[in-house]
UniProtKB/Swiss-Prot annotation:
SUPFAM superfamilies: Ribosomal protein S20. Residues 1-22 are annotated as: Disordered. Residues 9-22 have a biased composition (Basic residues). This is Small ribosomal subunit protein bS20. Keywords: Ribonucleoprotein, Ribosomal protein, RNA-binding, rRNA-binding. It comes from Rubrobacter xylanophilus (strain DSM 9941 / JCM 11954 / NBRC 16129 / PRD-1). The lineage of its organism: Bacteria, Bacillati, Actinomycetota, Rubrobacteria, Rubrobacterales. HAMAP family: Ribosomal_bS20. The keyword rRNA-binding applies. The keyword ATP-binding does not apply. It comes from the Bacteria. GO terms for cellular component: cytosol; small ribosomal subunit. NCBIfam families: S20. One of its GO terms (molecular function) is small ribosomal subunit rRNA binding.
């Protein structure tokens, strides 16, 4: 098998896998801010914990940069502190 073909196949596979993780992160972020806007602090805390795990895992696998994960989680904390 020619190397470029294999590389294309690997890239496509990684892209699909990483895209699903990034989509999940975006959805968790939206879910957090929706809960916060609705005034449901308990739900927002729960989603924040779920998001922390997901962001840390994605950063550990190199899907997103670790500084981006840290920045997002810090903003979640500040938003919660401002409301709570």
């Amino acid at each position: 098998m020619p190397a470029p073909t294999k590389r294309e196949r690997q890239n496509r596979k990684r892209f699909e896998r990483n895209r699903s993780v990034r989509t999940r992160l975006r959805n968790l972020s939206k879910k957090f801010y929706r809960a916060l806007d609705a005034g449901d602090l308990e739900s927002a805390r729960s989603v924040r914990d779920e998001a922390q795990k997901a962001y840390d895992k994605a950063a550990g696998k190199g899907i997103i940069h670790r500084n981006k994960a840290s920045r997002k989680l810090s903003r979640f904390d500040r938003a919660l502190a401002g409301r709570g």
